[in-house]
Amino acid sequence: MAVYTDVAADDLADFLKSYEIGDLLSYKGIAEGVENTNFLLHTTRGSFILTLYEKRVASEDLPYFLALMAHLAARGVSCPQPEKTRDGEICGALSGRPAVIINFLEGVWPRRPNAVHCAGVGEALAKMHLAGLDFPQHRANPLSVSGWRPLFDLAAARADEIQPGLRDFIAAELDHLEGRWPRHLPTGVIHADLFPDNVFFIGDTLSGLIDFPFSCNDILAYDVAICLNAWCFEPDHAFNVTKARALLNAYQRGRALSEAEQTALPLLARGAAMRFLLTRLVDVLDVPEGALVKPKDPLEYFRKLRFQQNVASIRDYGVEAAGAVA
């Protein structure tokens, strides 16, 4: 979450007249995250989240995200639900941006995830993947392997400003990934952005998944790989096998990875690291002036990619390569 677009109090009050969520008491921007503009609203009827969708979210994709959240919630996945206007609409416009209000989900995201948190997210991810199997809508992933080189083209000329040699490193890795990316693994609905700040806990109990604007249809194990990178590294950049084992074991108790998925997981993790390296690289080189946003460090994912390049098999993540896991 972040704030790119400012919203005047009078404009917001007028916008809220279309909803039955009470009168506005206060609102504040949420600076965490990098993609959309978010505000925490306090009204006479409770707390809500207002999201203004920015550059990477097309307005025509919003029905997919919003319908998906309703679909998942109906199947027991805890996630926020959009508030409808008095006319039954779930998407409006504010400050020139598509805007949605969702209910406030209780809990906090873990600043220092532990193995219990990792097990919780593994279990929830498997549940989400299974719940999404009968979701009727389809959205291709614009940030999968076919979208990485266009992203690189946006940043290539200045990549070495971030780190000398980064341009050649990325170019070589893209060649490797594009030539080996798996085409026949199980697919379905994925979250595609399940970082710690998109998962809420109350104590050690997972209370909900949030922030679905990157959800799409893609390789299910790719979603697992994104989580390995997002949850299982320490602040000193060391990979924590205990966390990885907890995440993978919990996921496989809900949905076992096939032999082909297990074999492909290290490559998928390289691709997942590349995706976030590239989007962060583009973002850090193009922060709008005056934006209340904290760009994420692209070199964090450069280091994770370097680690994943040396992973030989799923055993390096702390689990056995075949059969049931403990």
Curated annotation (Swiss-Prot):
InterPro entries to which the protein is assigned, alphabetical: Aminoglycoside_PTrfase, Homoserine_kinase_II, Kinase-like_dom_sf, Pseudomonas-type_ThrB
GO molecular function: ATP binding; homoserine kinase activity
UniProt pathway: Amino-acid biosynthesis; L-threonine biosynthesis; L-threonine from L-aspartate: step 4/5
Record key words, sorted: Amino-acid biosynthesis, ATP-binding, Kinase, Nucleotide-binding, Threonine biosynthesis, Transferase
A Pfam match: APH
Entries under CDD domains matching the protein: HomoserineK_II (cd05153)
Record-level GO BP terms: threonine biosynthetic process
SUPFAM superfamilies xref list: Protein kinase-like (PK-like) (SSF56112)
EC number: 2.7.1.39
Catalysis: reaction(s): L-homoserine + ATP = O-phospho-L-homoserine + ADP + H(+)
Enzyme class of the recorded protein, top EC level: transferase
Keyword Amino-acid biosynthesis: yes
Protein family according to the UniProt entry: Belongs to the pseudomonas-type ThrB family.
Protein name: Homoserine kinase
Gene of this entry: thrB
